[in-house]
A protein has these predicted regions:
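Short, solvent-exposed loop/turn elements at domain surfaces
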Residues: 76-77, 150-152, 187-191
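Exported/periplasmic cell-wall-interacting domains
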Residues: 130-136, 140, 160-163, 168-177, ...
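Cell wall/extracellular polymer interaction/catalysis modules
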Residues: 81-88, 93-175
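Solvent-exposed coil/turn segments that connect beta secondary-structure elements
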Residues: 25, 39-41, 47, 100-102, ...
Length: 277
């Protein structure tokens, strides 16, 4: 009952996320309750989700591009000591990248005349229509763990690009060449990885799930409010709209190339379990 008396079941305790799908909501004594698809009620607060979406292309762009992942002003040269120029750019603003230099321990991107932004605040899509080593067909998905981007290629043309969130240490997304082996429009995901299972999470109706490496999958993440930074248990999180686009494009058997141009992601197989959301 919505009053909280006589519970019929429970979701395991822990510090991880808890999300359920609901069909109705109500306030009882000022407390929010939602009705599950099973007819049961539970105390929970409705949640929104990020509406960011990537870019689809009819032809491959001529240069690299990317997104700002934070609000920031450009600098007149590639240095944090250089004067700020122009207006503050909003998070997820699209940028064109015309030059790249190493300065002060990171990449800096020239996004216009005398306008530079650091990797710390932006992410780059490396446009490369050459199939990665081992890719045998004319369709593939590339996941860049350093830049936290996903690109989709067909007939050696870039057709889609977006920001993602991949596995955070020590739950990295494993580099390698894989194939999508199962697609599910909705999936319930749960798990715990730490001793004592204090990090248990439970996620209902995870949308547009495409498994490619054991329990690691490409999927929508309605709970995530920041893309462009790692932080999953090994899956590759996309916005809801991006996951839907990819799910509709992808076929079972399509190849997924996961790589880290910085070489920082471990490749030792003993460091990788089955993965998770």
């Amino acid at each position: 009952a919505a009053s909280g008396n006589n519970p019929v079941r429970s979701i395991a305790a822990g510090a991880g996320l808890r999300y359920v799908s609901y069909i109705n909501e109500a306030l009882v004594n000022g407390e929010p309750y939602v009705q599950l698809k099973t007819g049961e009620w539970m105390r929970a607060s409705p949640s929104g989700y990020l509406t960011f979406q990537g870019l689809a292309f009819q032809k491959t762009p001529p240069n690299d591009f990317g997104w700002m992942i934070d609000r920031v002003k450009a600098r007149s040269s590639p240095s944090f000591n250089a004067p700020e120029v122009g207006e503050e750019m909003a998070q997820y603003s699209v940028i064109q990248i015309y030059d790249i230099v190493e300065s002060e321990g990171m990449e800096w991107y020239m996004i216009g005349p005398d306008r530079w932004v650091p990797y710390q605040k932006s992410r780059r899509v490396r446009v490369d229509t050459t199939p990665p080593q081992g890719v045998t067909g004319d369709r593939w998905v590339s996941v860049d763990l350093y830049d936290q981007t996903l690109t989709v290629y067909q007939n050696r043309q870039l057709v889609f690009a977006t920001l993602v969130a991949s596995g955070g240490a020590p739950f990295y997304t494993r580099p390698g060449l894989f194939q999508i082996y199962e697609k599910k429009p909705l999936e319930t995901m749960s798990g715990a990885f730490e001793p004592g299972k204090w990090d248990y999470y439970y996620l209902e109706d995870v949308p547009w799930t495409m498994y490619f490496d054991q329990a690691r999958a490409l999927h929508g993440a309605y709970w995530r409010d920041w893309f462009g930074v790692p932080g999953t248990h090994g899956c590759v999180n996309l916005s809801i709209g991006d996951a839907a686009w990819l799910y509709n494009w992808a076929n079972q058997g399509d190849q997924v190339y996961v790589w880290d141009p910085s070489g920082e992601t471990p490749t030792d197989p003993s460091l990788y379990g089955a993965g998770g959301a």
